[in-house]
Amino acid sequence: MTNIRLINLFIAALFCALNASAASLPKKKYPGGKCYIWRYTLEDKRESSYTLDRPQRWLSHKSIERRHKQGLPLDSTDLPVSSGYLKAIEHMIADANRSTKRSQTESMIIGTSRWNNTVLVRSADTTFLRRLGEQAYVKRSEMVWEAPDSIERMIKIKANYNFNSWDSLKGVPYGHGREQIEMLNGHRLHNIGFRGKGITIAVLDGGFQNCNCIPTFQHANISGIKDFVYPNSPSFYQETDHGTKVLSTMAANEPEVLIGTAPDAHYWLLRCEDQETEQPVEEDYWAMAAEFADSLGADIVTSSLGYNEYDNRPGYYRQRDLDGHTALISRTASMLAQKGMVLVNSAGNSGMGPWKKITFPADADNSLTVGALNQQRVNAPFSGVGPTQDQRVKPDLMALGSPACLISGRGAVIRDMGTSFSTPIVAGLVACLWQALPGKNALEIIQLIREQSDAYDKPDNVYGFGVPNFWRAYMIGRLTNDK
């Protein structure tokens, strides 16, 4: 009891410190004035110039091959949003902009989702936005973002180019990351050469501070970056370091300091979390990032993001909505396995608050939701619990996250707490396992990992199926391949 109370007090003090720090940052008036983003769900995909027999027009060769290898056919959700409807919207926008005062922000399309058949439109003119929602080809419309009055001024953070002498653990190859990989028996996959080579992981996060200059990442296989947040950051690598920490648990390769769980994998860094506000449009950004990951041929999506409440929108979601399909973000997440990808998503850190449960999209079907354990393999009190509204086991897995060893945006070795970090630790080992068992499809990999977790026969709402054993998953998976 004493240890749990101490942990609770520590977490509460940490959250208070973070909130106090955020409150003290300098502010500036939101650039461009008051404007809004509305989401329009279209009726269908008629009047389109795209056809399912020519997917190479919008999907990469790697994406098409991934589906072909897993026997997954294309369907109507894969088709881009109707080019005919987009042209109609663009004509309406052009007419609206011609009558707009120069002091106002011009209207424009800022994104689409082919899986959800939606379009995002930004404008300062709410009359125009409502009129657009009345068009025959629009099924539903909703305001999903409102410009804040002010935002924080960006403060550039310099990175360290060398580790401190005490960061090195002589004679310990994995350095400070030893416990988090050994808890999952993943080091044994590394020992026989499976370190994620040939696997592409898309990291969906809010920022990757200094990943372009921290020496640790200079030798990582970072294939590319993309920003889905409106407006795009003027300095992609100076946003929050949350994604930097996440990436380090997988991609770091610093012997005796920190070796991540998939140092040989390839990574795409996709920014889809807006740090300035918490609004429903972030679900759209996440969906656009997930679809982009699909189109470039990613094998795994790791996401340490979760939502359950939004600014000035009390009651937007209820716990009964945790069914994997009500929230746009969860509905999108539930489609990843159908496209041949494995989603590894954090359970969320709401366990100590009034919500307590997992957050969206941790309720997604056919995904691996990860909670956090402490070093004694006891669940962290902040880790979100299940089950889903339709009584599926959640979280699926547990891993070290209270605390985990990471590299911060300053390039320093630190320990931090959250399901945000237990999640990529697992995602990296999913990459290693899939490298070792390339004949498996996404659903088979997901089920294999669940089945080789230590509570598979007696899952509950706190630990899910328990702690996965990736070495045993490999051994069992290899046996089934040989049959």
Where are each of the predicted segments found?
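Subtilisin-like serine protease catalytic core
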Residues: G177, H187-K226, N232-E282, L296-D299, ...
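Substrate-binding/access-modulating region of protease and related hydrolase catalytic domains
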Residues: N253-E256, L269-D363, G409-T423, N461-V462
